[in-house]
C-alpha cells in the first residue's frame, strides 16, 4: 500500500486571508494497512488527525483488487479512522502527483475538490459520493456507485469521467454523459440539460422518476418514466410564443399555432432523452455488463425473485 496525505500549514489554517497555496505532503507505505498507517503516524511529528480529511482519492488499481480493497475498508472501519462523509474520488495518477496539484490549483487538493462538488447544483446534496457510500455498496454487493474520476493535467485537475462500482466488482471507467444519464435514471440529479437542434437547449428540473417492472414469458422488463419541468433556451420567436401562451393560459385561451410549436419542442425533448437513455443502457450493457438504472436498489429488498430474474435476463 502507498498513501499520500496533504496537510494545510497551521499558519494558513489560522489565517483566513492566506492564499493557502502550499500544504505539507506526507508519503507513507506499508505491506499491509496497519504498517501503512503506523508509518504515517511515525513520519508525522505530531499526532495524526484524520477528522478533518476532506477527500479520499483511491487509485484505480485498489478498486480492481477486491481482496486488497476489502482489507483496506475493513481496517478503516475497525479503527474508525476516516469520517464516512469524506468525499470519494478515483484516479490512475500516482499519489504524489495528485498531491502536488495544490501548487497548480492555488489551494489544497481536498479543498478544491470539495468546492467543485458543492458548486455543482445539478446533483442532490444527499447523493455526493463518500466513503460511506463505498461502505454501503460493499455490504449490499449489487448496488451501483458512480465515483468521480480524477485526471491530473499539467495546468488543471480534470473531472470528466466516472468509475463504476457494482457492489464489490469494479466495472471500469465511464464517460461523463453516460454516467450522468445513469444518475438521472436513478433520480440522483436535481437538473439535467439537453441540447436540441439549432443550438437550442432545455434544462430539466424538479426531476421525478418512476419505475415499472413487468414479466412476460419469463422475461422481466423495466420501464423508466421521467417527469420534469423544462426551461427552454432557444430561438427568440418560440420563446415569445411560450410567454404569450403562458399569458393566455391564465385567461384559459390558447393559440393553436403557439400550442403546436410547444408540442413540437416537447416531442423533441422526449425523443432526444429517450435516444440518450437507450444509448446509455446499450453502452453500459456492452462495455460493463452493467444495469445503469440500479435495479437492485429498487427490487432487491422487496421483490427478490423478480430482481434475480431481471439480472439473469440482463446478463444473458
Predicted regions: what they are:
Residues 1-316:
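Membrane-proximal alpha-helical signals and transmembrane carboxylates
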